[in-house]
Amino acid sequence: MRVLAFEDSYDITAILAEGGVDLSGIELRQHWNTMDCFERIREFTPDVLLLDHYIPPTKGLDVLHGLLELIATGQIDRPGLILGISSSDEANDAMEYAGADASIVKFKLGEHEVWQ
């Protein structure tokens, strides 16, 4: 499984490992900012895209809006799962409302069913 994460504060590999996720078979790439985010998504073609709501310089919510436009016009392939990750329930709700498949508090990321 190919996982692309945009998260600026916490190491996603560490969060998943602490959550008991078996990382074998997972190719995880984390970016600590959203610069060139669409090119990174296009090049990596993730199965799972993790988007932090408050990441700079472009917030994850704005990245999601732009990504969905590019998908709609056929300019980029849609990841199998787009998952909003934030420490704020309100931010996660906003990500789902905008078109993310699901969202989760980032510290509970290891509990999500995608890792089963």
Where in the sequence are the language-model features?
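Alpha-helical interaction/dimerization surfaces of two-component signaling modules
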Residues: 18-22, 40, 94, 98
